[in-house]
Amino acid sequence: MSIVIGADAAGLRLKEVVKDFLEKENFHLVDVTAEGQDFVDVTLAVAAEVNKEEQNLGIVIDAYGAGPFIVATKIKGMVAAEVSDERSAYMTRGHNNSRMITMGAQLVGDELAKNIAKGFVNGKYDGGRHQIRVDMLNKMG
């Protein structure tokens, strides 16, 4: 499993904080950030890498998280969540089988961003009754 991470200019500093934290937690990180990319390009790059392996997860950071979330939900088969708290990050894995989260550097601080990332990457899909919704989401697009 790889954690694919990317950011636009507004999310660069926080991306480095999250990236360093996850590397210290022994996760394999793939950083697809390229200079000058806007959130659309970054989100598409993260999604492309996430979709290479079923177990890959993605994190996109910009100013507010909304833009990358909108982009991610346009990608067939991608279930994503815009999060700004640890519980939502964890639960979106458990109940929605989300493979990507977005967050805003102007909304969350360093420690909260680390906890959001930790909750997301450590979350496990619960399946069961949640699979009906996930199947519905995966048919959209």
From Swiss-Prot:
Catalytic activities: aldehydo-D-galactose 6-phosphate = keto-D-tagatose 6-phosphate
Keyword Isomerase carried by entry: yes
Keywords carried by this UniProt record: Isomerase, Lactose metabolism
Superkingdom of origin organism: Bacteria
EC number(s) recorded for this UniProt protein: 5.3.1.26
MF term (GO), any: ribose-5-phosphate isomerase activity
Pathway: Carbohydrate metabolism; D-galactose 6-phosphate degradation; D-tagatose 6-phosphate from D-galactose 6-phosphate: step 1/1
Matching InterPro entries: LacA (IPR004783), RpiB_LacA_LacB (IPR003500), RpiB_LacA_LacB_sf (IPR036569)
One Gene Ontology biological process: galactose catabolic process
Subunit note: Heteromultimeric protein consisting of LacA and LacB.
Record family assignment: Belongs to the LacAB/RpiB family.
The protein's name in its UniProt record: Galactose-6-phosphate isomerase subunit LacA
Gene: lacA
